[in-house]
A protein has these predicted regions:
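Positively charged, small/polar-rich N-terminal and surface patches that mediate targeting and assembly
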Residues: 1-111
Length: 111
């Protein structure tokens, strides 16, 4: 499964957007043979990052079936795209950089 996140959103929404995208894609295409095989065997999710311009290009019909994920707490802003599971994705989508988790310095104790 391939998920594209839009760069420039609040970083705290990236994990939520990815999770929502993966679930939305699975529920939409769960009866598809490749999706079923992916869920039963592989279950890898490739999460890519796209500039706003690349994100718009990634929404193009030529890249196949997709769902655009919006975030209500950001006023309905589009934050992610999930694509139907395929054997291989178009070169443009593969060329996008992987999303990298940014480590923060969090308090060691809550309270």
């Amino acid at each position: 499964m391939l998920i594209v996140l839009k760069a420039g959103i609040d970083p705290s929404y990236a994990p939520v957007g990815s999770a929502h995208a993966a679930l939305a894609g699975y529920l939409e295409w769960e009866d598809d043979d490749l999706t079923y095989e992916w869920a039963q065997r592989v279950f890898h999710k490739h999460i890519k990052m796209a500039t706003p311009e690349q994100f718009e290009k990634a929404k193009s019909e030529k890249y196949g079936d997709k769902i655009v994920i919006t975030e209500s707490s950001l006023g309905g802003e589009e934050i992610a795209i999930v694509y139907r599971v395929k054997e291989e994705y178009a070169g443009f989508l593969n060329s996008l950089p992987k999303w990298k988790v940014k480590v923060c310095s969090c308090p060691t104790k809550l309270g």
